[in-house]
Amino acid sequence: MGFSETRAYSAWGAWSTWLTICLALANLLPVTAKSAADYFVDSLPGQPEGPLVKMHAGHIEINPETSGNFFFWHFANSHIADKPRTIVWLNGGPGCSSEDGALMEIGPYRVTDDHMLNRTDGSWDEFANLLFVDQPVGTGFSYVSTGAYVSELDEMTSQFVTFMEKWFELFPHYEKDDLYFAGESYAGQYIPYIARAILDRNKKESVQAQNRQWNLKGLLIGNGWISPRHQYLSYLPYAYREGIIQGGTDASLRVEATISKCMKKLNVEDTTGTIHIADCEDILQTIVDETHKGNRCINMYDIRLTDAYSACGMNWPPDLKNIEPYLRYKNVTEALHINSDKQTGWTECSGAVGGNFRALKSKPSVELLPRLLEEGLPILLFSGQKDLICNHMGTEDMIKDMKWSGGTGFELSPGVWAPRQDWTFEGDSAGFYQQARNLTYVLFYNASHMVPFDYPRRTRDMLDKFIGVDITDIGGNPADSRIGGEKGPTTSVGGHPNSTTAAEREKEKMKSAAWKAYYKSGEVALIVVAIAAIIWGVFIWRSRRQKLRNPSHEYRGIYPMLGSSSSGSLPRFSNKRGRSADDVEAADFDETELDERPSRAVSSRSSREHEPYAIGEEDGSDREGEGSDERRRLVDKS
């Protein structure tokens, strides 16, 4: 090796050493922590005109060892009635995304067929901040290392409390809000467990020393999977009542045989499998199979509808066909700050999560409710009348058997039960209320498994009553909501002057007024043209008569005194009527301009070939194998 080569080699060796040292030092430097600003969503594809609801979204790591990350989507309240409130919403499954709640139920926007966003009349963000969370890990936009799924409720709870602590570190100004948890279906297991953990956390000296207690004020659970025993045994009575199965038929005998197998499991003293019992799950499957005719079957989430067999409700609600492609567009995932580590596109429910979450060592959440109520925590349970999978009869039977605060069920005193009070909303019979000792039950008539999807305004009225919103000091037009004939606290559901929906209605009124003015101006123009035509006709008629009387005189047009200029009068009039670019009225009221969408609209795609925004294929585990089979077997209680 020559001198120059040796020197070059030595120089490279020194440089390599320095590079190694620099990289090592860089690894020792702390990674810059994210701030709230990193999660700010400044725009969304397809957003409606006007200001966007203030929102933040993204991932928070809750388990570095397994790369476990929760996805959240937070919407700030539109107005504060008397004090700040935050509602955490969870969907069920297990393994179903809370974007269902955000975009089909209580959130401020819903996705249209052309993937635009429309404001929801009755959304829950009017007087409360909304926090939607995809959990357990692997649900929706949340993700985790393969095989590291959650299987028990205690583990789920621990991860969720970790998430809340980290979320409040990012957004400390919300930590002292009145805090509520709401959700539906299998969230009936999640929510009581999380509530118990929060109350226990608040008692810790370390938490109290830092003044970091969370102001948990209440729980709302819709069509909840809370007491599996009561729910399993309610399926056939509900099917009889609704005419799904006829008594004394071969179909009823087949269902009763399945119930007998379930009862053997329920009567065995066993500390495992009390939340998910395969033999008992078969009851619902058998009922649904008995409705199979042709290629259709009953929709287990809304018995008024049917679905393709063997989905039997899995394709419902209809908005789902709009949401999945919308949440897979690249510009949407970028707007929501979806990490690149999330390899697969959004799916509503994860078969892998549901298949692992059996909770075989967990006790049903119904066993937690009495103590929560006795500690003074208000709880509201509500049910849609036309839901089969988590039907209202199971919830009502559970309440009737539950003991707390010295009474059973809705007892006011021994043998005296709280009455069911009829509820009317805006003149319609909406359902009934029943209340006693911190527990409220609401039945919604003609509603499905997802009550807010059917009745956003009614559920908002229910919410405002429960959390204590009273618009008396705010002003506005109160909603006509009566329980037992009495109005109670005044709620607005978008009727107060500063509400978002009121502003939207005012905008529609202004647009309608503009169109009326346009049509009115058109009518006036038509009258003017008609009068001009009559005058024209009179002049023509008189000119012809004059020519007939004086054949020696040449016809010189309408204006005989103007000479040759008369020949240009009609063309100029015609040109005025046929104007385009110079027509101020036409420019102001061009229908195509009024119907024009914002330029950021996401266009629907007719085929995979024209979908450049897709960010990944569906998770195979969600569509086939055990996970898919469990969805067909109706495990998912979203």
From Swiss-Prot:
Residues 583-594 have a biased composition (Acidic residues). It is found in: Golgi apparatus, trans-Golgi network membrane. Coiled coil: none annotated. Residues 542-638 are cytoplasmic. GO terms for biological process: apoptotic process; proteolysis. It comes from Ajellomyces dermatitidis (strain ER-3 / ATCC MYA-2586). Residues 1-33 form the signal peptide. One of its GO terms (cellular component) is trans-Golgi network. Protease with a carboxypeptidase B-like function involved in the C-terminal processing of the lysine and arginine residues from protein precursors. Promotes cell fusion and is involved in the programmed cell death. Glycans are attached at residues 118, 331, 438, 446, 498. This is Pheromone-processing carboxypeptidase KEX1. It holds the Pfam family Peptidase_S10. Its main location: Golgi. Residues 34-520 are lumenal. It catalyses: Preferential release of a C-terminal arginine or lysine residue. Belongs to the peptidase S10 family. InterPro entries: AB_hydrolase_fold, Peptidase_S10. It comes from the Eukaryota. Residues 622-638 have a biased composition (Basic and acidic residues). The keyword Manganese does not apply. Its EC number is 3.4.16.6. It is a single-pass type I membrane protein. Keywords: Apoptosis, Carboxypeptidase, Glycoprotein, Golgi apparatus, Hydrolase, Membrane, Protease, Signal, Transmembrane, Transmembrane helix. Residues 489-502 have a biased composition (Polar residues). GO terms for molecular function: serine-type carboxypeptidase activity. Residues 477-507, 566-638 are annotated as: Disordered.
